[in-house]
């Protein structure tokens, strides 16, 4: 699994590397530039015909850009740089990179015409952008976006909030984003994910802080190795038992799709507790699943004891009967710490309960989309991707997917 960081977490990791590991900011900047240049050069179709423009801001992202321009030029790729902003506002590191670029006579342009170039590199704003992009910066990014050139973003596309993925007025639309050390959360959420294009995470020598936990991760193909192998002498009873509390009248499809997915993902046995109206369709579509339409506590307890994983919600509905079913299983699962996956109407029913957090803990996995998360948090959808609002997983110690 790869860790995904916020701007604050990235700043802390960066600071730890500089202050405690003793690797200076200019060294990290040079490493970032080298990694970006490697990714760009790999994608050049004809180095002799390429014309690359690096658009640099005055912060450290701009310093990365100036170093990129210099290294490309030294590799024999025709490269120019453009400074967006006033030089007197440059950070010390970026001012140092400008001095180095001038020493190596990397050509600078003062009038921007992006259509002259085959590749445009965006190094205007980094992960610390905290205000809307307006005025000349908005015009600049708009001009860059209109160009037909191949577009590369340094660390994150300028104008994308690195925590939420939201567009701050306008954002650079990259074909490739080379991000450093860790993937930023804004490159996972839309529209930031879309604006990032192909996303490459590069190692520049910034690592996790020992004992410091980063709570968000994304899976990679190699993580499939964590799944246990199916032993050749096993049987359906040893490959996992799934109980679905799913499907209300007229909502058979969600129950069917969820149960079929459980079987396809190698569960040995699947049982569906649903309403009587869904029995025949489910038995016809999915004869390998077991169907139960009774709701009494003795049978419920037997099913709960039987299963390894409990899934509540697909097509369940939010009526009184559905609420009763969901709350009974939630309460009993909380007592025995049975693994529970809450999805769809399971989340909607949870959100209307006054004290819903008492039902959840480390045994619970929530799978909300943005609307369901809005109802759980009691916040407007437009504010949900402010990550300070969706950290319900932290105080309650549950898994959020």
Predicted regions span which residues?
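Short, conserved catalytic or adaptor-binding loops enriched in Gly and charged residues
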Residues: 98-102, 170-171, 191-194, 357-358
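Small/polar-residue-rich loop-to-helix segments that shape phosphate-bearing ligand pockets
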Residues: 98, 118-125, 307-316
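Nucleotide and nucleotide-moiety/phosphate-recognizing core
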Residues: 38-123, 132-154, 333, 357
